[in-house]
Amino acid sequence: MEFEFIRNTLMGEYYVKCSMGHEIVGRWLQEEIGKDPTMIAQVEALIDKAFSLPSQEHTLTGTEISLMIQGDEVLVQENALSHDYDVEMESEFDFYDAESTASCGIEDFVALIEQWKDFLNI
């Protein structure tokens, strides 16, 4: 997973750009976690928990996007995708679903979080 951090010094805003197929990870980091040191600490605690109990699923439910870690796999997914919908409509939403969920290895995810902290000077 490739990513880039952008700082708008005039507006004091921070942005995350992730590679194709991982855009939702950038949205999650930017919108759900942002510059909040408490939220970043919660993510780090979840990662530590996942390393110590790899067979369990560890979840951080966000307002719109949630994080799930199990073993060495990280899944970021829009909360709307966890709702059931009609099977006939399933094919119509395939493209939307592809942009609304992404997975990566835990090592890549840890690197993303550490570099985000460094970028924000937290």
Curated annotation (Swiss-Prot):
InterPro entries: UPF0231 (IPR008249)
One Pfam family in the UniProt entry: UPF0231
Ranges in a coiled coil: none
Family: Belongs to the UPF0231 family.
Listed name of the protein: UPF0231 protein VP2494
